[in-house]
Amino acid sequence: MSWQTYVDDHLMCDIEGHEGHRLTAAAIVGHDGSVWAQSATFPQFKPEEMNGIMTDFNEPGHLAPTGLHLGGTKYMVIQGEAGAVIRGKKGSGGITIKKTGQALVFGIYEEPVTPGQCNMVVERLGDYHLEQGL
């Protein structure tokens, strides 16, 4: 299965039990910042934004004082899982990033999608990739 298929069929799909509700944007990005696959709506990000995200996975709490920036959008960092998941909030939307062995799985959402739904979609795919050694 291609990386783009994972984004299209597992991240940008309807959320279980909520037909028509889906993430706003999604991507799979290598630890080096190279995009493996992305939705058409995923923001163009700067290398320093990806560096900050990778630093936070290695040094949890790094982004808390400044916020998480992606594509020029600032998210307030909220509770996540140290070294495994970063979650951010901005207004009625937010972001979930799950770290796997080789990549980061991104999901960005706006209402009516809830933070919990975004977490479920992103973390399920990330956990699957971890189980596969990816």
Swiss-Prot record:
UniProt motif Involved in PIP2 interaction: location: 84-100
Gene Ontology CC annotation, any one: cell cortex
Keyword annotations from UniProtKB, A to Z: Actin-binding, Allergen, Cytoplasm, Cytoskeleton, Disulfide bond, Phosphoprotein
Residue numbers bearing the Phosphothreonine modification: 114
Main location per the UniProt record: cytoplasm
Matches recorded under SMART domains: PROF
A single GO molecular function term of this UniProt record: actin monomer binding
Pfam families cross-referenced by the UniProt entry: Profilin (PF00235)
Post-translational modification: Phosphorylated by MAP kinases.
InterPro entries, A to Z: PFN, PFN_euk, PFN_sf, Profilin_CS
Superkingdom as given in the UniProt entry: Eukaryota
Compartment(s) of residence: Cytoplasm, Cytoskeleton
Disulfide bonds: 13-118
Keyword Transcription (UniProt): no
PANTHER family: PROFILIN, PROFILIN-5
Subunit comment: Occurs in many kinds of cells as a complex with monomeric actin in a 1:1 ratio.
Function of the molecule: Binds to actin and affects the structure of the cytoskeleton. At high concentrations, profilin prevents the polymerization of actin, whereas it enhances it at low concentrations.
More details: The variability of the residues taking part of IgE-binding epitopes might be responsible of the difference in cross-reactivity among olive pollen cultivars, and between distantly related pollen species, leading to a variable range of allergy reactions among atopic patients.
Family: Belongs to the profilin family.
Listed name of the protein: Profilin-3
